[in-house]
Amino acid sequence: MANTPRYWLVKSEPGCFSIDDLAALPGQTSMWDGVRNYQARNYLRDSMKRGDRVFFYHSITGVGIAGLCEVASEPYPDPTQWNPEDRHFDPASPADAPRWYVVDIRLVKKFARTIPLNELRTLPELAEMELLKRGSRLSVQSVREGEFLAILAYAEEDCP
């Protein structure tokens, strides 16, 4: 069971970092930094593992699931927390007891089109999905296997 991949969804504002930005990077891989919510941090630090599958979700504009990624590293301390030049700088985070963590994510596939929320709401398998619950704002969310498979099947059927 320890080697069984888990499933996640990460949110990003395309104006800050989009799936196209990820696709343009060497190895199509990036550190997923700047998470400053404790529950989201706990997912990154305590639960995400290399090989887990991740949906890349665009928020604010072009809202929806834009593609599929994978976790490409084990969790490690977010270096931006100690960089005073970075907008994610946290002066209260000691170097010997990091407060914030990251994982690297690698692009697996950009979907032919972003799958919007209103379409996700039509899939019965997603009735209990965290993303679709009122007030759900967490930037890192777990996804149940059935939800993951339903979205992936929909994306492949709709966006080959």
Indicate residue ranges for each PLM-predicted region.
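Residues that flank catalytic or metal-binding motifs in active/ligand-binding sites
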Residues: 6, 65, 101
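A short secondary-structure junction signal
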Residues: 20-22, 81-82, 116-118, 151-154
